[in-house]
Amino acid sequence: MIIYNTTYSVSDKVYGSFLKWVKEKHIPQMISSGYFSEFKLSRVLTDEDQDGSSISLQLTAENVNAVSKWREQYGDLFEMEISSLFSVNVLYFSTFLEIID
């Protein structure tokens, strides 16, 4: 099992609408794709003063291949949607985490 982690840097001016979109649209789409089984949505705690907030979305998948298939099928649509909704107010990067225990 792996965790597909995406960390978002979210501007204060779109924070509320971003969380609403993630909870009501993005997470349900990810789970209903069949490639992910569980999720955790968290705020990243930092000591620094920064503009905006960092949000982590962790989705559990069977393996890296499942995430690759999701990216092939839905990755472009996700990128277009997040860009059209939030423009430069939301930036993100993704990483893979292997579940050890």
Locate predicted features.
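Mobile, glycine- and charge-enriched loop segments
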Residues: 63, 73-76, 95-96, 100
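Hydrophobic transmembrane alpha-helix bundles
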Residues: 68-84
